[in-house]
């Protein structure tokens, strides 16, 4: 077992950092700060950060095949032009639910942008329940709705053979799997593959490694856990020096580094003193596993 090293590479003080995505072309980590309405890009070589502020909470960001990025902003799927800091609306959802916003999102292996919604929180993880839905933005900009009655739509990824879709609705305290049809994007046969332990708290963002194992960030649990989706067993726990770990992705030149986002909102003054790096970006090396490059949106 290689020795694991955890370092805070950027003290960004995110209110709620989320959606880390490695951009290979720019050697950068993209991420968002949801309540600050910001998309950020941290260059791993220069250590510089560029920030784009949008007009609504921005909850996820993804690469785009045609260049630039796509993001979920409020209840809209948007194309993001980094150079002029502009966002163009591609589609909108939940028009009848004024209190909703998007949460986590990710692009599937066929280039569809999956993202789910939730009600705005009155405090971290406190909200009107069952208000969210899971959607996907297809390459032709049409949107499909998969299901509703979601509390906090969160982590998502696909198995290495593209036959299983993994999904987290945070307040179910479960990691779920669906059968997945790559050609159509259809999902079916939902089942739970892992129930969170009490000390792991709330399942949040998620990614997959090249061995087909899942990594889940545990909000309020201060850790990422590695799961075997076939056996339902937890294989590994990596604890971080912050409680509110929100999401994770692999990056770096060979995708052997893990990047973890976290939040400072919800910490009291004592918590902030004890966790000065809360809201920062963490890099974990020495895990001994690698991840996959993120898929770009095809539209």
UniProtKB/Swiss-Prot annotation:
The modification N6-succinyllysine is found at residues 244, 253. Its cofactor is Zn(2+); Mn(2+); Ca(2+); Mg(2+). It holds the Pfam family SGL. The active site is at 204 (proton donor/acceptor). Its main location: cytoplasm. A divalent metal cation binds at residues 18, 154, 204. Its EC number is 3.1.1.17. Keywords: Ascorbate biosynthesis, Calcium, Cytoplasm, Hydrolase, Metal-binding. InterPro entries: 6-blade_b-propeller_TolB-like, Regucalcin, SGL, SMP-30. GO terms for cellular component: cytoplasm. It is found in: Cytoplasm. Binds 1 divalent metal cation per subunit. Most active with Zn(2+) and Mn(2+) ions. The physiological cofactor is most likely Ca(2+) or Mg(2+). GO terms for biological process: L-ascorbic acid biosynthetic process. Monomer. Gluconolactonase with low activity towards other sugar lactones, including gulonolactone and galactonolactone. Catalyzes a key step in ascorbic acid (vitamin C) biosynthesis. Can also hydrolyze diisopropyl phosphorofluoridate and phenylacetate (in vitro). Calcium-binding protein. Modulates Ca(2+) signaling, and Ca(2+)-dependent cellular processes and enzyme activities. Belongs to the SMP-30/CGR1 family. This is Regucalcin. It comes from Sus scrofa. The gene is RGN.
